[in-house]
């Protein structure tokens, strides 16, 4: 008698489990599943994500790179010394370069030469997403500007469109330039663009961005702008904040407390 398709699938599944030396209800499998559950919490969701950088607090720790190291090690960002081929998700720029429109002759001298953290601004009106021919970069409903490295064809239109220099192009295979690869996050290949994604993969696991967790002085605050009770809203309502190149109309979602 011919075996029906449903019965065949059942038999195939049982055979596969037997060959694997266990069953779905085996103690080892259950323990492994429990360990996985411990690692993944409830996703952190928001309507409009934003980052607040406290420049005063950050300036107290001169030379600190904890957030940069955490971000780059978490996301397998290669350490390439050649400036023209450097890949970076979060880095430091002089205040005068990061905020050219905030300059005036009476600006505090130490602030003019101070280095500030910069990364993708996850603009509310991102020019990068409009020029991508393959939709490899797009803005989610919660405001995060994403990247799909498998769809990226390396045209670099988005790099040219970004007025903040927040996107890096892999001119070479980045893998040899990663000291220790994080197996939990994909590496990229030569010929694709990459950038900060506000740690979307960590938010999905119920974790805050790596840079925020790494900052021991709480200089970085991440939260939902549309939540009146969020810390980012409280800080922005209490203190004066600036955004990079506001005249461009991109509406950055990274705010700097000065």
Labelled PLM ranges:
Residues 22-60, 247-258:
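C-terminal segment of N-terminal export signals and the immediately downstream linker at the start
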Residues 28-40, 73-112, 138-151, 166-192, ...:
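Non-heme iron-sulfur electron-transfer modules
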Residues 1-19:
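N-terminal secretory signal peptides and thylakoid transit peptides that target proteins
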Residues 5-6, 158, 219:
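Short, cationic motifs built from Arg/Lys/His that form the positively charged side of catalytic pockets
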Residues 42-63, 103-209, 213:
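Ferredoxin-like iron-sulfur electron-transfer modules
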Residues 204-258:
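Long, compositionally biased charged/polar accessory segments in the mid-to-C-terminal portions
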Residues 59, 63-79:
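Hydrophobic alpha-helical membrane-insertion signals
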């Amino acid at each position: 008698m011919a075996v029906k398709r449903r019965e065949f699938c059942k038999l195939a599944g049982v055979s596969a489990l037997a060959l694997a030396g266990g069953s779905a209800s085996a103690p080892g499998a259950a323990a492994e599943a429990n360990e996985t559950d411990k690692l993944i919490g409830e996703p952190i969701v928001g309507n409009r994500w934003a980052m607040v950088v406290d420049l005063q607090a950050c300036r107290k720790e001169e030379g600190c790179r904890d957030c940069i190291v955490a971000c780059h090690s978490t996301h397998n960002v290669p350490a390439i010394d050649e400036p023209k081929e450097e890949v970076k998700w979060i880095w430091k720029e002089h205040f005068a370069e990061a905020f050219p429109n905030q300059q005036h002759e009476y600006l505090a001298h130490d602030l003019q030469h101070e280095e500030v953290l910069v990364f993708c601004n996850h603009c509310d009106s991102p020019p990068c997403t409009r020029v991508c021919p393959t939709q490899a970069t797009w803005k989610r409903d919660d405001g995060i500007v994403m990247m799909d490295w498998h769809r990226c064809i390396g045209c670099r239109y988005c790099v040219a469109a970004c007025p903040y220099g927040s996107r890096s192009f892999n001119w070479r295979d980045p893998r040899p330039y990663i000291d220790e690869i994080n197996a939990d996050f994909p590496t990229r290949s030569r010929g694709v663009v990459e950038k900060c994604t506000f740690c979307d993969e960590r938010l999905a696991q119920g974790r805050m961005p790596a840079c925020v967790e790494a900052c021991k002085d709480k200089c970085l605050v991440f939260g939902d702008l549309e939540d009146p009770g969020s810390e980012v809203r409280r800080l922005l309502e209490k203190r004066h904040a600036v955004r990079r190149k506001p005249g461009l109309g991109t509406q950055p979602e990274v705010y700097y407390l000065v």
